[in-house]
Amino acid sequence: MGNIFHTPVLLDEIINLLEIVYVNDGFIFVDCTLGEGGHSSAVLRKYQNISVIGIERDDIILNRAKEFLVEFKGKVSYFNAWFDDFFSEYSLSSKANFILADLGISMFHYKMSGRGFSFFEDERLDMRLNPGAGGLSAYDIVNTFDKVRLENLIYEFGGEHYSKRIVSSILEYRKIKKIKTSRELQGIISKAYPRIKLKINPATKTFQALRIYVNDELFRLKRSLPLWVGSLSRNGILAIITFHSLEDKIVKEFFKGLSKEQYCILTKKPIIASFEEKRCNNASRSAKLRAIRKLYE
């Protein structure tokens, strides 16, 4: 078994939810965001008679997951696809007993992908989770979008109140040369920011906005939600881990809109990481877990 870069968040809380519905016969666990396989490996190690369907849009990280989960050969089915595409194009042989979607970006992408996800690394701006599929990269966006389009993007998907100042600096820089790397963009943003105390890096919100836009993350989430609940078995659970308010609001409102006769919300308030987990795993600090249970089909 190989090593992984990413520590799965809220793992104990996911296991606690699984305990509610686990049955020792034909249990199907769907990991919509397999990553390196952290959540799935823990589930497979704890429960002997369980089948995992692992969905991952990045073929490179999917191969890492296959190496990490090699000891569970025969218990995991792998699919290289976006989770919304998978559920719209494939039919499960049986309804799922548990569906998990961890919407965070893997530490592998920040540390090892070389695609410019992190402003601490000096990498070519890309941010596509599946670059082989084509589509606009972050490089294309920051070098070709006009003023209004860039301002709207950074404000809408990043909640960045200094979007106009940032875009003004980007456009000035573009007059001289193209913005090629994540470190380059981070420097432009930092210089545009007012000199105020911040809890986060000035580039955080802009990088989030670019990544969300490049990968169409919010659209994919909205598209997936009805597909996920439709794929649950009777008494099945859908658990979703979000990492920013835009995602969390979408999930919260969708859950509230479901029939109270058919679905039971298991998290009246989102579950957050414990003090100890936050201390040991910085990635868990902004994580929120919401879950529902399907009472009948």
From Swiss-Prot:
It comes from Borrelia hermsii (strain HS1 / DAH). It catalyses: cytidine(1402) in 16S rRNA + S-adenosyl-L-methionine = N(4)-methylcytidine(1402) in 16S rRNA + S-adenosyl-L-homocysteine + H(+). The keyword S-adenosyl-L-methionine applies. NCBIfam families: 16S rRNA (cytosine(1402)-N(4))-methyltransferase RsmH. S-adenosyl-L-methionine binds at G37, G38, H39, E56, F87, D102, H109. It holds the Pfam family Methyltransf_5. Its main location: cytoplasm. Keywords: Cytoplasm, Methyltransferase, rRNA processing, S-adenosyl-L-methionine, Transferase. This is Ribosomal RNA small subunit methyltransferase H.
